[in-house]
A protein has these predicted regions:
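Short, Lys/Arg-rich, polar N-terminal cytosolic tail immediately upstream
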Residues: 1-20
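Membrane-interface helix/loop boundary segments of multi-pass membrane proteins
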Residues: 143-170, 207-214
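N-terminal membrane topogenic signal
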Residues: 15-31, 163
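C-terminal membrane module of polytopic membrane proteins
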Residues: 58, 69, 223-292
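Transmembrane alpha-helix boundary signature
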Residues: 76-82, 105-118
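Functionally important transmembrane alpha-helices
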Residues: 38, 191-248
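Alpha-helical transmembrane segments in multi-pass membrane proteins
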Residues: 24-77, 89-104, 120, 124, ...
Length: 292
């Protein structure tokens, strides 16, 4: 019985080769793009045009959606399009990622509404651009940080559970640190709080993506988190952070975060390495040829 012929090596070139051989440089390049993408002054343009919040949200939606094309282009150039599909046993991964969605839903002002401490008043004509705006934030930021930065960090660390953990933490730390850019709008201690919870939501989105193997689960978690988080600021009146709301939000978040961490260490998510084309680092002197 003859042995099957070995697969031919596929030549690695272009941006995929850069991602694998100059990972740090590629991470830096993507972060620079992220800084530019989140700094587009669409709000100032809306004000200059004499529009209100609706125009600002429409411009934000259009701007962020268009800018999302670049990180999605990079996903294909890095040969990581597998993250737009799912891994084996993804159904179990969906169940394991449910705590991430609970964390996001916990960001809605549900308790103050039930207790009568706050009200949300929003017309349909206002909610449509708000809904699309929140979606575009999740699409842009997740395609950059979970679609590009996170897998690049997976290249940078060993291909094992510890390396995966470091990649989750490192990419989420970069995502959190990006929010320091808000200091250019004026110093506020709230910015540092935003950095902290952005790091945590980054970890949450990364785990949802790991469990399912699919980038759009991270987008969905981020979208839901922002949809609830900005709702009161845009359309609410009354008191948001009541004692009851703080307690419920904290307890639910801690329990769900604990479950996510437990699932991460219990579940074998190594299938994403092959699914997302995350190979071992090239040995010294490699000519850019992939493994068999």
């Amino acid at each position: 019985m003859t042995e099957p012929a070995p697969k031919e090596k596929r030549e690695i070139r272009g941006l995929e080769k850069s991602a694998k051989t100059d990972t740090k440089g590629m991470i830096f390049t993507v972060i620079l793009y992220a800084v530019g993408a989140v700094s587009v002054p669409y709000a100032k343009l809306a004000a200059w045009l004499g529009g209100g919040e609706n125009l600002e949200m429409w411009l934000g939606f259009l701007t962020k959606t268009i800018l999302s094309a670049v990180p999605f282009y990079l996903i294909f150039q890095f040969s990581m399009k597998g993250m737009l599909g799912v891994v084996p046993k993804w159904e179990t991964g969906v169940l394991l990622s449910l705590p991430a969605f609970v964390v996001a839903a916990d960001n809605f002002p549900i308790v103050p509404q039930i207790m009568g401490d706050s009200t949300i008043n929003v017309a349909f004509s206002q909610f449509v651009p708000y809904f699309l705006y929140c979606f575009s934030i999740g699409l842009l930021e997740e395609s950059i940080f979970r679609g590009n930065v996170f897998p690049l960090f997976l290249y940078a660390f060993p291909r094992n559970k510890k390396g995966m953990f470091y990649a989750v933490v490192s990419s989420s730390a970069v995502f959190g640190a990006m929010h320091l850019l808000n200091l250019f709008g004026g110093f506020s201690p709230a910015v540092f709080l935003q950095v902290g919870y952005s790091f945590l939501i980054g970890c949450t989105c990364a785990l949802a993506m790991l469990f399912t193997g699919n980038l759009f689960f991270a987008v969905a978690v981020h979208f839901l988190f922002d949809l609830g988080g900005f709702l009161y600021d845009r359309f609410g009146t009354g008191v948001l952070w009541t004692r009851e709301n703080v307690i419920v939000t904290a307890v639910v978040s801690v329990i769900m975060a604990g479950l996510l961490v437990f699932f991460f260490f219990k579940r074998d998510s190594s299938a994403v390495y092959d699914k997302w084309n995350i190979r071992e680092k090239y040995p010294s002197g490699d000519d850019g040829k992939a493994e068999k």
